Amino acid sequence: MAYTQINPATGKKFRLISAPVVKKDAKALVTGKPVYTDDLAPKDCLIVKVLRSPYAHALIEEIDCKVASRVPGIECILTWKDVPQKRFTMAGQTYPEPSPYDRLILDQRVRFVGDAVAIIAGETEAAVDHAMRLIKVKYQVLEPVLDMHDSKDGKILVHPEDNWKALCNVGADNKRNLCASGGETHGDLEAAFAGCSHIVEKTYHTKANQQAMMETFRAFTYMDVYGRLNVVASTQVPFHVRRILAHALDVSKSRIRVIKPRIGGGFGAKQTVV
């Protein structure tokens, strides 16, 4: 491979063929310099944690944060009442995304065990954990969808809301529990089967899986002197994060800057808004 460079002494262009080229960040990596998101986070950052749902499907009828908000060191507690009601997709895909706009930052309806209920920010992890235990939530527990074979056109809607939308024609329909649907055929399938001496039909199931990168999902944010929200995140898609975050917060993209430091692996899992 050939590389065209400029000689700083003469100003003339020259090419490197079959010669090693030093990576700009190589020395920092091998000497353990701070290059990853967690290395760069200021030591006085607020700690942010999320209160999670214990139910697979429920509506939040009441949420009381009064006592929790009085815990020393707690700066902010947010519920579904405090965030913009603009649905978005977490998928880091080029606009218009094929994935439906089905999420809110916080929603009154929770759809799986572990879904977000409240966001707590405080000066210390101990304060945040204490406040989280003091938040009182009253749920209307609903019947969940537990079997994908029963979900389509079933009696339980995962997303019954009217502001759900799909930007692309991928066969999505929230009133049928479909995030996408479609099919494709080539040639005469029945004729091909007729010419086979044996036909084997099987159904195979695999468990959910996830990439195992060494650096887990992490981010920190701060406001700069221009009033912009700066997001430093271990993401593979900084420009998608900027666009999707601006939409979710209902602000202009010009008010958000996303910085992607060196990431410790991603393998596609970090192609999302984290």
Where do the protein language model's features map onto the residues?
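Flexible, low-hydrophobicity surface segments
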Residues: 1-171, 199
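Short, surface-exposed connector motifs at secondary-structure boundaries
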Residues: 47, 111-112, 222-230, 264
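Predominantly extracellular/luminal regions of secreted and cell-surface proteins
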Residues: 77, 183-192
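Beta-strand segments within the central parallel beta-sheet cores of soluble alpha/beta enzyme folds
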Residues: 80, 255-261
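Acidic, glycine-rich active-site loops and adjacent beta-strand->loop/helix elements
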Residues: 83-84, 235-238, 261-266
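A glycine- and small-aliphatic-rich helix-loop capping segment at beta-alpha/alpha-beta transitions
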Residues: 95-96, 246-250, 272-274
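Conserved beta-alpha junction segments in alpha/beta enzyme cores
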Residues: 188-249
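Thiamine diphosphate
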Residues: 243, 264-274
